[in-house]
Amino acid sequence: MGVWAATQVMGKLQETDTALVIKNSIAINGTPYPIDDTYGIPTAIYHGTLEGLTGPSLHKFLRRMCFNGEAFKEFLNITPRRPLEELKEELAEIERMYLSLPAASFYWQQAVVGNNDRIIPPDNQLNAWRKEAEISRKTLRVHYTEDAHYQVELFRYYLQEIWTKD
């Protein structure tokens, strides 16, 4: 949901501060359409996750975010522990906001799509970025990786090697 949230925030910032210059924007394993059968997480899967959220199902979801068992263990060491009710409320609120807010007009220059993403189907991500390129009529570079939805090496690369380089 981070790409959608960033799209909303950055779109608002650009509306209010016309002098704001974004040199580079990279969406990683997400889309501006968080709940969508073609461009995001399929609606039935999202609702199934929300309605069936339990301790064991959350554990399974978090495991699916990671590439393998070792990556999952590392992820568990850094992820915050939150009450299930709080997570359910957040998921319900994300859907409410997604359905009620106008589409943001933020333009992503690059997108990273992990072929091993088991949260947002890679084909849906590709569909979303094709749609965004058509809407904006701008070039959008899509990078294909073999990464999972969350992969520490991927984020480390983009945060340390790319983002801090300039």
Regions found by a protein language model. Name each.
Residues 134-166:
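Catalytic active-site module of serine/aspartate enzymes centered on a nucleophile-bearing elbow/loop
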Residues 31-34, 67, 115:
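Short, flexible active-site-adjacent loop segments at beta-strand->alpha-helix junctions, enriched
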Residues 11-52, 90-93:
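Flexible "cap/lid" loop of the alpha/beta hydrolase fold
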Residues 95-105:
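The feature captures the conserved acid-bearing segment of alpha/beta-hydrolase catalytic domains
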Residues 111-113, 117:
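Short beta-strand/loop motif that positions the catalytic acidic residue
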Residues 38, 52-95:
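Conserved alpha/beta-hydrolase catalytic His-Asp/Glu region
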Residues 107-109, 121-131:
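Short alpha-helix in the alpha/beta-hydrolase fold that links the catalytic acid
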Residues 1-6:
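Gly/Ala-rich beta-loop-alpha elbow adjacent to hydrolase catalytic centers
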